[in-house]
Regions:
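Helix-turn-helix
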Residues: 1-24, 28
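Amphipathic alpha-helical interface segments
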Residues: 14, 61, 65, 130-137
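Amphipathic, non-transmembrane alpha-helical scaffold segments
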Residues: 26, 30, 34, 59, ...
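Hydrophobic alpha-helical connector segments
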Residues: 28, 32, 39-68, 123-127
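Secondary-structure edge/capping motif, primarily at the C-terminal ends of alpha-helices
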Residues: 44, 73-80, 138-142
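Short secondary-structure transition hinges
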Residues: 63-103, 111-112
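C-terminal peripheral helix-coil segments that are non-catalytic and often amphipathic
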Residues: 100-112, 129-130, 136, 140-165
Length: 165
């Protein structure tokens, strides 16, 4: 609390008038950081791209942004790796928003004849969960090289899967 008061140039008592506990402050910081992801993904949604290109851009933007946020904020980085359930609790609103964005991309792809999906919301849920599953290895640098250098293979896998043509 002392560090937060010092950094914000406020007294500890002043902080407690706005926040009940350190956890409340932590959640406020995480929510502010997650707004950056939302803003960058909003930018992707505004781009004039084909739905398949927009989907790939969306995934890469999500991963790059979360990596930047976690690496920039030491406390968040420690909690992200040690207590993901706390981070999950705070990011529920973002997850729901991302799923809506993904659904919009998928529906546009269906409309344009690019995608054949029976349930766009369920597909959005699956994509959202798959991307979240890649976050930790991506942040640690275990996937970043492959994802940067194998974008075409990743795109082919995303759109064509495992089956032979």
């Amino acid at each position: 609390m002392n560090d937060i008061a010092l950094a914000s140039q406020k007294g500890r008592r002043t902080l407690y008038t706005y926040f009940k506990s350190k956890d409340d402050i932590y959640f406020a910081v995480v929510e502010t950081e997650l707004d950056q992801i939302k803003n960058r993904l909003d930018d992707v949604m505004q781009k004039d791209l084909r739905p398949d290109d927009k989907l790939v851009d969306f995934i890469y933007t999500h991963l790059d942004t979360i990596k930047d946020i976690v690496n920039r904020n030491g406390n968040l980085k420690a909690d992200f790796f040690s207590n993901i359930s706390v981070v999950e609790k705070v990011r529920r609103k973002l997850d729901l928003r991302e799923r809506v964005m993904l659904k919009i991309i998928l529906e546009k792809g269906i409309e344009e004849g690019l995608f054949s999906i029976e349930d766009p919301y369920f597909a959005a849920l699956m994509i959202n969960n798959a991307v979240k599953g890649m976050e930790v290895p991506y942040i640690r640098g275990e996937l970043e090289y492959q994802m940067k250098n194998k974008r075409k293979q990743i795109t082919n896998f995303l759109f064509f899967g495992l089956k032979q043509k």
